[in-house]
Amino acid sequence: MNWAFFFTSNVGRKIVMALTGFFLISFLILHVGLNSCIFYDLPFFDPNDNGSMFNRAAHFMGASFVIRLMEIFLFLGFIIHIIQGYVVEVKNRKLRGTSYERALGNRGSKWYSRSMAILGTLIFLFLIMHVSHFWVPSRITHTLDPVTYGNVETHNLFFKMYETFQNPIIVVLYVIGVISLAYHLFHGFHSAFRTMGVHNRKYLNMLKGLGYGFTLVICVLFALMPISMYLDWVSPY
């Protein structure tokens, strides 16, 4: 097989997008699981936690060699997924022909399935904002306030989150980013399986339902994080 031709073909690019998409979905599960530790501060868990569970979990992840290695693959996965997505979108636009032909071909599709490139761009901009707010000061500049648990000193990332989400504009931008992610996943989740060879209507419908459920759980949790901190449901005080 000519691998160079395969990975530059439309089918090959879509397979690469599907595989990197699966990898990024697994990251979302890990990321939302870690960040959900902030909710341990809620009154029905431990209102005196003050971010302790989240900070200790974040410290463990940041100190793990395996996790740091995975971050490299994560960034590569994002870059490859984004580049391949734009290339496929440009090629598809060239193949669609006239606007009349596009209208005929898109009558049965959802608006978000036709807007994956736009949604992907919004997610990319959201990702830049998110990384600059938390990952850079935590991993690169080390400008976060310290906090000590037992004999272990770590970054007070919980306080940084709270401080960041006191700005209503940032909260709105984060919610927009999460909504963009939701619509991107609504189409991308089952489409990735279809690209990998699942064409049975019964299984595709099942995967669509699974994808919708997965997306709602992940994105509702992500959206609740800035909202709950802005409304002081979760706080370091």
What are these regions (language model features)?
Residues 1-237:
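Membrane-embedded alpha-helical bundles that constitute the cytochrome b-like, heme-associated redox core
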